[in-house]
Design a protein with these regions (language model features):
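Iron-sulfur cluster-binding electron-transfer modules in prokaryotic oxidoreductases
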Residues: 1-168
């Protein structure tokens, strides 16, 4: 159902803590339109033994971090580059430290993995791209504290269009 309470930056730690930190990318769509998905992801990550955090951007702007994909989609390459650069500058130190970057919105994650490295053509953008995982990839590839058991029922899965297009 519709949530009218946006996801606030104060809902997550802003620096890595604990033995298994994971950077949770709070994308614009999830922040404003499906904040409960972020809150649920935070609970699942914590239950799995991770300590999710979301770093704040520098003080150049009060705007939350964004991948810039929407700017690219309307041909505003300069603004997309500036938006992406701000994100990469914030995430690069964590990527260099080997901290996974996990998110919920496949189109934004694929922008981080594919479009931003091509757009910025920097070592930092490449390093960030290497650490990006979907929420599902993190839970499937990392050892977790979750005790998941196979369901004895059929389930339908509707994949995101960007996941299908990129074979994820």
């Amino acid at each position: 159902h519709w949530q009218c309470r946006w996801f606030q930056s104060t809902e997550l730690a802003v620096t890595p803590i604990g033995e298994r930190p994971v950077l949770l990318f709070v994308d614009t769509f999830s922040r404003y339109f499906e904040p409960e998905n972020l809150r649920s992801a935070q609970r699942v990550l914590s239950a799995a033994g991770f300590t999710p955090f979301a770093p704040l951007p520098d003080q150049r702007s009060t705007k939350p971090l964004c991948c810039g994909r929407t700017h690219l989609s309307v041909g505003n390459v300069a603004r997309a580059r500036d938006t992406a650069q701000r994100l990469v500058e914030t995430y690069a130190p964590y990527a260099a430290a080997g901290i996974p970057i996990v998110g919920l919105e496949p189109s934004c994650l694929l922008a981080l993995k594919d479009e931003i490295p091509a757009l910025l053509n920097t070592q930092d953008a490449q390093q960030v791209a290497k650490m990006v995982l979907t929420f599902e990839e993190l839970l499937l590839t990392e050892k977790t504290a979750l005790c998941l058991k196979p369901l004895q029922a059929k389930a339908l899965l509707h994949g995101h269009c960007h996941q299908k297009a990129f074979g994820v």
